[in-house]
Amino acid sequence: DLLTAIKRVKESMKRRT
């Protein structure tokens, strides 16, 4: 789903600091 992909991408960006 697009929401799932966006959620994963958002989490990945947040961990990048």
UniProtKB/Swiss-Prot annotation:
GO cellular component: extracellular region
Cellular localization per UniProt: Secreted
Superkingdom to which the source organism belongs: Eukaryota
The name this protein goes by in its record: Cupiennin-7b
Threonine amide modification, residue list: T17
Tissues expressing this chain: Expressed by the venom gland.
Major site of localization recorded for this protein: secreted
Keywords (A to Z) from UniProt: Amidation, Secreted, Toxin
Recorded family membership: Belongs to the cationic peptide 04 (cupiennin) family. 07 subfamily.
Organism: Cupiennius salei
One term of GO molecular function: toxin activity
